[in-house]
Every structure is written in structure tokens, then in C-alpha cells.
Amino acid sequence: MLRKLIETRDLEIDGRTYQTHYFEMRTVRGTRRYSCEVMLTAGDRIILDDDTMTSLEARVARLAPATVYSRELASRRWIAA
């Protein structure tokens, strides 16, 4: 199953820009699946997939910011009071 790049976009989250790559692939049964790679850093990516491009775009808009915020919180060092 080969992925075909169908679109590259920039996604802005809190003033920072992340590159996204949208792919289409055919399953063994011949149906289409869509996936998106959100490039957070050189070695850190979020990969999401869905049955339709419309629902994938909605999923990326909802989950990419949540992932960025959670990773930002996880990287902070907390001092117990």
C-alpha cells in the first residue's frame, strides 16, 4: 500500500507554525484512507488517519493543538508546594 501525498499545509497553534502533510492510500479492499503527519520537531510527529478528508481535517484541527499543549505541559518541571 503506497501513500500518495495530496497536500502540504501549515498549521498555526499559538503563533507557532507546524507543517502538515496529507496522504491518500488505497486499502487491500480498494477503499480510500487518508492520513496526516503533523511535524512538531524533526523527530516528533503526530500521525492521524480517517476515512474521509473532511473528517480528517476536523480531527487534525481538534487533536493537534491538544497534543502540542499536553507535550508542552509534560516538558515543564513542576515544583511541589
Regions found by a protein language model. Give the residues of each.
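Negatively charged, low-complexity tracts enriched in Asp/Glu with abundant Ser/Thr
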Residues: 1-20, 81
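Intrinsically disordered, low-complexity regulatory regions of eukaryotic regulatory proteins
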Residues: 5-8, 22, 35, 70
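A structural detector for beta-sheet-dominated domains
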Residues: 14, 23, 39, 59-61
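Enrichment for repetitive, rod-forming helical segments
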Residues: 16, 23, 33, 66-69, ...
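A short, structured beta-strand/loop element
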Residues: 19-48
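Mixed-charge, Lys/Arg-enriched low-complexity segments
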Residues: 42-81
